[in-house]
Amino acid sequence: MIRFERVSKMYNETKVVDSLHLEIKKGEFFVLIGPSGCGKTTTMKMINRLIETTEGTIFIDGKNIQDYNIDELRWDIGYVLQQIALFPHMTIAENIAIVPEMKKWDKEKIRKRVDELLNMVGLNPDVYRNRMPDELSGGQKQRVGVVRALAANPKIVLMDEPFSALDPLSREQLQKDIVKLQKKIQKTIVFVTHDMQEALTLGDRICVMRKGEIVQLDTPEGIIHNPANDFVEEFIGNRVRPWYEGKIIENVLPLVSGGQVENDASPLSIYASLQEALIRLEVEEAVPIERDGQYVGALTSRHIVTYLAAQMKERG
């Protein structure tokens, strides 16, 4: 879907992105994370040419992005900003309709699309269609920002720390909403964040960056199980470890139900440690869990990631 081949970006003599080689799969939720100045936002902005590459090539569906008409490229890539950036003197419907109007959709098609998108994020079109941005809460504005990016049905959506300016409750709700929304729309989403809990909650894969380079690219489970080096261990591992050290499988039990496991897989007790479960899950997709000899469910890496993300959020 999106492929970087030896992509670099320089400002004066400083390389802010250094020879990136990566591929983002169609329909995946791909998270870029790292400390401030690591190049994650620059990497994302090179996809829609808001920032031009210095070296290397980016391909979308096998085509060099330099071969696209730049306006059409950007119209076909949704973009959600941290600052939301709704036009204050336009109604909510008018804000959402900007790109469809640029693409010369007819008015009835636009009206139906606006109403469909508002319903998709829980905003009643009859109530919100003709409101002005200053009549909405921060969370409602960001919902509009998200659906505006989806208005022309792009294949790709870029999200630049879209929830970081929101209060904790709004942020948590929007994270849940975007997970549900992605299950429906199956877009290719590139999401920038500095928040590990957010990355664990949202990402199919997480790309950890440092000084313009990829340090580790893996699933949330893979990064938790096998941090690539001391930097990842410090940036992610040390943040996660306090939430599983000393914990037992029983702590995760509310998340576990049903599931299929290999017939010959030996069960773990609910009183076994999460560390023991993690070791098993390095080589097994699911581990059967038993209580007093009775099967209670199959534990997967995703159960543990969900538990750890919730613990990190709850305790900061």
Task: Give a label for each model feature.
Residues 151-155:
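A short, proline-enriched helix->beta-strand linker immediately N-terminal to the Walker B motif
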Residues 108-127:
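Conserved ABC ATPase "signature" region
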Residues 48:
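Helix-to-loop junction immediately C-terminal to a conserved catalytic motif
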Residues 131-136, 140:
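Conserved ABC ATPase signature
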Residues 217-218, 226, 298:
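ABC ATPase "signature
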Residues 261-285, 289-294, 300-316:
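The conserved cystathionine-beta-synthase
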